[in-house]
C-alpha cells in the first residue's frame, strides 16, 4: 500500500496548523515547509512555528522535519499603524514556487496551502490557484478554499493546539514568551474567528 506524501506550507498560523493536523490525522507523510522572505515578524513567527513543530512531532511519527526555505523579497513590508489592506505582492506564487521546488526535489507529488480565498487580493482566489496549478508539475491542494476562518476552526481544529498558533504581524517577546500584539488585522481576525467556538 502506497503512502500519501504532501508538502505543507506551514507558518504556525490557524489555517496552516489545522491543515497540517488534518493531513497528519489522515496518515499522510507530512513535510512542513516554512518560507522566509525577510518580513519583520518572521523571526518570532518562525521561533513559535518550530516550537509548535516540536510539540506536534511528539504526537505524530508521520510528521517529517521542518524545512525552512528562503526566498528573495525585493521590497520589505513596513510596519504599519493601519494594516487592514495589507497586501504582499505575489506572495502565494512565491510560496507555491518554493514549496513546489522542494516537493520535486523530494519526489513528492502534492503540496498544500491553507489559503481561504476570501480576501480581495489578485493571487488569493480559486481561479488563480487553478492557473498556478497548471504551471507546476505537482498537485496543488487548497482544502480550505472558499471557507471563512471560523469555519476552518469549527470543522478542523479538534486536537489542534490553537493556543500555540500565532497570527500576528507585530509579535513581541516578553519574559521568554512570544506574545501577539492583539491589535493588528491578523490578530483581530483570529480573535473574531475564535469567538465562534463559544457560540
What does each model-identified segment do?
Residues 2-199:
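Nucleotide-activated chemistry modules centered on ATP-dependent adenylation/adenylyltransferase
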Amino acid at each position: 500500500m502506497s503512502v500519501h506524501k504532501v508538502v505543507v506550507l506551514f507558518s504556525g498560523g490557524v489555517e496552516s496548523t489545522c491543515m497540517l493536523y488534518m493531513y497528519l490525522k489522515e496518515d499522510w507523510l507530512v513535510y512542513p515547509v516554512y518560507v522566509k522572505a525577510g518580513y519583520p515578524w518572521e523571526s518570532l513567527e518562525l521561533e513559535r512555528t518550530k516550537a509548535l513543530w516540536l510539540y506536534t512531532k511528539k504526537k505524530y511519527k508521520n510528521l517529517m522535519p521542518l524545512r525552512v526555505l528562503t526566498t528573495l523579497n525585493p521590497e520589505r513590508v513596513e510596519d504599519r499603524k493601519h494594516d487592514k489592506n495589507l497586501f504582499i505582492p505575489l506572495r502565494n506564487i512565491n510560496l507555491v514556487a518554493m514549496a513546489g521546488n522542494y516537493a520535486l526535489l523530494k519526489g513528492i507529488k502534492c503540496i498544500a496551502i491553507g489559503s481561504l480565498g476570501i480576501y480581495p487580493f489578485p493571487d488569493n482566489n480559486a481561479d488563480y490557484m487553478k492557473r498556478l496549478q497548471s504551471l507546476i508539475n505537482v498537485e496543488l491542494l487548497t482544502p480550505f478554499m472558499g471557507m471563512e476562518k471560523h469555519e476552518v476552526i469549527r470543522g478542523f481544529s479538534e486536537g489542534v493546539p490553537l493556543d500555540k498558533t500565532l497570527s500576528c504581524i507585530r509579535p513581541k517577546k516578553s519574559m521568554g514568551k512570544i506574545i501577539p500584539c492583539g491589535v493588528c488585522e491578523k490578530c483581530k481576525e483570529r480573535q473574531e474567528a475564535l469567538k465562534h467556538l463559544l457560540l
